[in-house]
Regions:
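Short, basic/aromatic recognition patches
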Residues: 14-38, 74, 78-79, 93-98
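Flexible, glycine/charged-enriched surface loops at secondary-structure junctions
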Residues: 26-38, 83-84, 179-182, 200-216, ...
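Short, small/polar residue-rich loop motifs at catalytic or cofactor-binding pockets
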Residues: 37-40, 103-106
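Extended active-site and interfacial segments that coordinate phosphate-rich ligands
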Residues: 59-73, 106-109, 121-158, 268-290
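Hydrophobic core positions in small helical hairpin nucleic-acid-binding modules
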Residues: 61, 65, 97-98, 171, ...
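A short, hydrophobic, proline-anchored segment that marks a local hinge/packing element in signaling
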Residues: 104-114, 122, 254-256
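Mobile "lid/hinge" segments at catalytic clefts and subdomain interfaces of large enzymes
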Residues: 112-199
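Accessory "access/gating" subregions that flank catalytic or transport cores
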Residues: 193, 197-270
Length: 344
């Protein structure tokens, strides 16, 4: 096993290159302009446990979704043999690993070498229509998630390399733009397959043990860099309460010490009857982006970068909605999370 600094740096750069190639493949083959022109997507790589292993490519908030989605899949498919080489999983449900809203389809593929699960390649992209009460699957009148489109709670889209046609048919039949959606699905599948192939090649070249050791080393470095930066930030407890356009107040309390960056969002309004809620995972993603920008904005992001971050939310609040709360315009609320912590 090689664990010298040069080999580790090569593997780190190769992980980023794989994510970049996944991004390019999806952009070139997608059929929706929101993917190939707007670039409303993200790609990334996790280790076998679903911990983010590279900064990925695309929208930072999207990349922060991928590890959470994979971890939900690992929990759901925990039985021996439930995850096999060639499988591709799909989720879009914010209450089952999808994190954002139903338009954003997450695809994840396990990476095996010699029968051992060593990593995951994953992507997420906004799809133009996944059903629901309004064209485009987004409506300000939605009061529950069921009105916003088809829910996919982490299912196998590809099993052992073969398409699960029943799932494909269910997805496309529920869309007003089935041909475009199907094309985007295959673009996403091609993307994760390319990523998986590159990771397999990397692990074979340097050995599985070196590959896994390198990812663990990156995460430890990320943790060390973050904790060193924490010591340079102002310490203490900082609070902010800000009135919103509808008269409600959003509140945040941030406590910074040498060992922890604690964000407390528990004292906030109950979830809405409107589609402006966000999932707890979505709230965490926003806190992670802010935390990274404060501690180590110039270094690659991975699981270790966020070990010193703790986020407290209250279940049933707008920042930790319970199903089936509507969540279509989650991003408006998530941006407020970022702003609140930053201004605090």
């Amino acid at each position: 096993m090689k664990n010298d600094s040069i080999t580790l740096e090569i593997i780190q750069s190769s992980l980023q290159a794989a994510a970049d190639e996944m991004f390019a493949a999806m952009r070139k083959t997608a059929m929706s302009s929101i993917i190939y022109e707007v670039l409303d997507m993200g790609t990334g790589i996790t280790d076998a446990q679903g911990r983010i292993a590279s900064s990925g490519a695309g929208i930072p908030a999207f990349i922060g979704v991928l590890d959470k989605a994979v971890q939900v899949l690992l929990t759901k498919y925990s039985a021996d043999g439930a995850i096999q080489p060639g499988d591709v999983f799909i989720t879009n449900d914010p209450y089952y690993g999808g994190v954002t809203h139903l338009n954003d389809l997450v695809l994840a593929m396990p990476v095996f070498v010699d029968g051992k699960l060593i990593a995951w390649s994953a992507n997420i992209a906004h799809n133009s229509d996944v059903g629901g009460m309004a064209p485009g699957s987004l409506s300000g009148e939605a009061t529950e998630l069921f009105q916003e489109g088809l829910r996919l709670p982490g299912v196998k889209l590809i099993s052992g390399g073969q398409p699960n046609q029943d799932i494909m048919d269910i997805i496309t039949t529920n869309s007003r733009m089935p041909d475009v959606l199907l094309g985007d699905l295959w673009a996403g599948i091609a993307s994760v397959r390319i990523g998986a192939r590159r990771l397999e090649e990397l692990a074979v070249k340097y050995s599985v043990d070196t590959f896994i050791s390198a990812m663990n080393a990156f995460m430890e470095t990320g943790d060390q860099v973050t904790r060193a930066a924490l010591k340079t930030l102002p310490h203490g407890t900082f609070e902010l309460s800000e009135e919103q356009d509808d008269g409600r107040f959003f509140n945040v309390k941030v406590t910074i010490s040498d060992e922890e960056f604690l964000v407390d969002l528990r004292d906030n309004p109950d979830q809405d009857a409107a589609p402006t809620n966000t999932s707890r995972d979505g709230t965490i993603v926003c806190a992670q982006m802010l935390f990274k920008s404060l501690t180590s904005p110039d270094t690659p992001a991975n699981d270790g970068s966020f070990r010193a971050l703790t986020v407290l939310t209250r279940e049933g609040s707008i920042f930790h909605a319970q199903e089936p709360a509507a969540i279509g315009f989650y991003f408006e609320t998530e941006v407020r999370v970022y702003d609140l912590i930053w201004r605090c």
